[in-house]
Amino acid sequence: MSIAKNVGGVPHMLSNIRSSDSYYDLKENVTNTLYKLPGGDHIVERIKKTKSNLKQIILPGQMFECMGISYLGPVNGHDIEKLIKVFHVAKRINGAVIIHVVTHKGHGYKPAERNPAKFHGIGPFDIVTGKELKSSDKPTYSDVFSEKICQLAKKDKSIVAVTAAMPDGTGLNKFSKWFPDRFFDVGIAEEHAVTFSAGMAAGGLKPVFAVYSSFLQRAYDQILHDVCIQHLHVVFAIDRAGLVGSDGETHQGIFDLSFLTSIPNMTVMAPKNGSELSAMLEFALLNFNSPIAIRYPRGQAYETGLEEHNAPIRYGKAEMIIEESDIALVAAGNMLITAQAVREKLKEKGYNITIVNERFIKPVDTDMLDRLSAVSYTHLRAHETLRHL
């Protein structure tokens, strides 16, 4: 059996042979001829066993062959002629076929070849240098998270960080360099990341699982069974929550609230700006001892004009930003910016507007809602999601 990576010309040669029409023509002709001979069935069976044993030594893909799935490859994914030949062969095979195509990420563009992770998802960039054209040098929410978790980890050695193959996107690169023994990249396996975090929490550590909202939904079962029902202290740092723009439709973070708010023992928070994200992360790690999620959007950590509003975070309590009469806008996270814009338009029409920073999406601050109801407000509650509780 092969242990290390296959090297040399033999695997390459056999891959070319198996991916050609002439190989399958010869195979069919020989097999049909042998079946016509006395004892042909036995001969064909012996040849198949010999072939299988040889393939296990020098060819990849045997897991699929053992399941009755034909395997073709590996094939150079940048060679169009070879790919066309392989696809023609695959059409001739009766049954399931796996075509193993090997590509080089960023192939043909040197900046992308040198830094494929950076070019996995990128906005506008200089095509000559490959440098991203940033609309602002101000820190993103991911940057704020990165700085704060490193700051807290310096003081508390029980803090560990987990990612599912996304240290760059989630801002954990710095943590991985500063605290390599407390950083865990589990690969593209969000389900395992959650259960792994649960195990560390059960052992007395303080795991922070940094993940994109759209990928967290893969781990719903583990969040429910392995973390929340067990009441374990796992912090979910949910990046790219809400609409993500240029990241594309597969990355839209609009479903996490729908399932997180339905799970028992789960607390969900959303910061109005970067400084509140820092405060929430500190609260979640140092002043809380149960499952908790902090969801924040893609991009720049907004300067909301509300920086002077920084009341200490108390569990389950909202923050009163502006208290007036007529209409109350209760908003969470980056929807505070929308609430401010709405307030300005309504003020032009003579309305007095109250703005409340919800902070905790779950649990809802019912005391605050009772306070607002006592003044006979018209209430509007704003989240960036498809549905919410």
Give the location of each predicted region.
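Long hydrophobic segments that form regular secondary structure
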Residues: 87-90, 332-353
